């Protein structure tokens, strides 16, 4: 069974508790369970992970090559300044789609810039947890072509 790796970055372990008016009430565990079921219904496996540590995220991106058909990445605040994560994305051959629960472009100005998005297949922002499902569909469609 093909695998899609889902990587969530810093503070996403606080989903459901942290600013629910922005990020929603669904917990990270709820999100992971939802994505696992979503993938299985389409004949795929979702490998869901979360870390508050940049090095873990980099290691997982590297690990995705050879193990996964694609990566869904929510780098959290690392989006705005982690050239190390950007370089990790650029170093692998599997497609990466960046996802953000909130519309980062409608928030504080420092959130408007993504150093990681230019090396991804695409970016989905502001659609809540459905954004992850849309990213998965995009990766699965890419597999069919």
Curated annotation (Swiss-Prot):
Subunit details: Homododecamer.
Catalytic site: 23 (proton acceptor), 100 (proton donor)
Enzyme's top EC category: lyase
Keyword Amino-acid biosynthesis: yes
Record-listed E.C. numbers: 4.2.1.10
Pathway: Metabolic intermediate biosynthesis; chorismate biosynthesis; chorismate from D-erythrose 4-phosphate and phosphoenolpyruvate: step 3/7
Source organism per UniProt: Halalkalibacterium halodurans (strain ATCC BAA-125 / DSM 18197 / FERM 7344 / JCM 9153 / C-125)
Catalytic activity as recorded in UniProt: 3-dehydroquinate = 3-dehydroshikimate + H2O
UniProt GO MF annotations: 3-dehydroquinate dehydratase activity
Record-level GO BP terms: amino acid biosynthetic process; aromatic amino acid family biosynthetic process; chorismate biosynthetic process; quinate catabolic process
Binding site for substrate: 74, 80, 87, 101-102, 111
Annotated site residue numbers, Transition state stabilizer: 18
Disulfide topology: none
TM helices/strands, residue ranges: none
Keyword entries, A-Z: Amino-acid biosynthesis, Aromatic amino acid biosynthesis, Lyase
Annotated family: Belongs to the type-II 3-dehydroquinase family.
GN (gene name): aroQ
Protein name: 3-dehydroquinate dehydratase
Job of this protein: Catalyzes a trans-dehydration via an enolate intermediate.
